[in-house]
Amino acid sequence: MAASAVCRAACSGTQVLLRTRRSPALLRLPALRGTATFAQALQSVPETQVSILDNGLRVASEQSSHATCTVGVWIDAGSRYETEKNNGAGYFLEHLAFKGTKNRPGNALEKEVESIGAHLNAYSTREHTAYLIKALSKDLPKVVELLADIVQNSSLEDSQIEKERDVILREMQENDASMQNVVFDYLHATAFQGTPLAQAVEGPSENVRRLSRTDLTDYLNRHYKAPRMVLAAAGGVEHQQLLDLAQKHLSSVSRVYEEDAVPGLTPCRFTGSEIRHRDDALPLAHVAIAVEGPGWANPDNVTLQVANAIIGHYDCTYGGGVHLSSPLASVAVANKLCQSFQTFNISYSDTGLLGAHFVCDAMSIDDMVFFLQGQWMRLCTSATESEVTRGKNILRNALVSHLDGTTPVCEDIGRSLLTYGRRIPLAEWESRIQEVDAQMLRDICSKYFYDQCPAVAGYGPIEQLPDYNRIRSGMFWLRF
């Protein structure tokens, strides 16, 4: 009786609320409060402080109330700076960083990191290399000392190099088992064919077997220079303390290049082309289609990120069905077109890849390509203000939620100083997002998508992947 009474009371209360006429001004108040709160949150983000040592090494930090901190060294070095002969050297060096230094031989480095309860990590991309440690804020002096030892005093012992060859070769086998990784390597290989951006970060297996201590030392001496480095920190750190520690441990990093051979970026042209790797034994097809995108600092990036947010992403494990906000996701669910899809905007210094990747069964590839290109053409010709507003809100949410924790913030600081030369405040990102409207989005999408030659990579049972000329013809509409 009590439960039914509560139910009846709730229902009657709802009916009263529905009959009550509310002022439009009152209806707008929550939205106004939400907007004000978001704007205030942007203004309350801690300032990123940046200093430069005498040798050109940049020191940047964002202080917060966290009891932990993440500190890392970001270096302008990656597979784009490598040649066919030494491709993979940067990735090899990154692995050897954990295998001891001249001051901490063998596993002494890992033991010292574990003794303070810290986490040591490193990664390489096509343009950057990073070494980072997450630890308690009180251990900041030890963390900076360890990072300085890693980037300056790698032992590069012959025995460790030989051991690491097998480790890297096993990792490459594991990467080859990831169809998504393979497809994106294929996409770079065809889109930037004949240029350094076509090279994989790990390098070919023959290079891994052949690289010598001399090759690795030459690469380190050429690229690990102070003006190409950023020491970044986020969390419970004071900038002055970080600067003093950097001065103590990193001021000796050389800024002089041998024979004035300053590493430069080789221009990388984009080529509309395709790579197809058909394997009917695999259960699902992976396909990536991309046009040439803008570089990091290009202002068009914000508008294109809004466009990607409108198209969205999808996975068959999501709820929502045909009621998903993304038109492409709704069509994919209704027609059972794919297992998943995602949009991407991969930026480099002067170019990029802008497109989508999807996973589907063999008989759905043609339809998925058709609907994907239809969404691109629709954004070029008839994007509406309502969906642009939705895309902007999605981008705002992603921008803020991405910077949750000391490690993402530290990565953002290090990467931003290498790519933009500064850390762009969230308030500035918000103002750029706010400027985007439907007309701007249509113009920018037309510039990058409409009647452009795409790069296509397919892997798996891809017999039904349309011919390249047909895919190319889907990049424009005949409108009379």
From Swiss-Prot:
The modification N6-acetyllysine is found at residues 111, 138, 163, 248. It is a peripheral membrane protein. It comes from the Eukaryota. Acetylation of Lys-138 is observed in liver mitochondria from fasted mice but not from fed mice. It is found in: Mitochondrion inner membrane. Its main location: mitochondrion. Residues 1-34 form a transit peptide. Signal peptide: none annotated. Coiled coil: none annotated. The modification Phosphoserine is found at residue 212. GO terms for cellular component: mitochondrial inner membrane; mitochondrion; myelin sheath; respiratory chain complex III. InterPro entries: Metalloenz_LuxS/M16, MPP/UQCRC_Complex, Pept_M16_N, Peptidase_M16_C. GO terms for biological process: cellular respiration; mitochondrial electron transport, ubiquinol to cytochrome c; mitochondrial respiratory chain complex III assembly; response to activity; response to alkaloid. The modification Phosphothreonine is found at residue 214. The keyword rRNA-binding does not apply. It holds the Pfam family Peptidase_M16_C. Component of the ubiquinol-cytochrome c oxidoreductase, a multisubunit transmembrane complex that is part of the mitochondrial electron transport chain which drives oxidative phosphorylation. Belongs to the peptidase M16 family. UQCRC1/QCR1 subfamily. This is Cytochrome b-c1 complex subunit 1, mitochondrial. The gene is Uqcrc1.
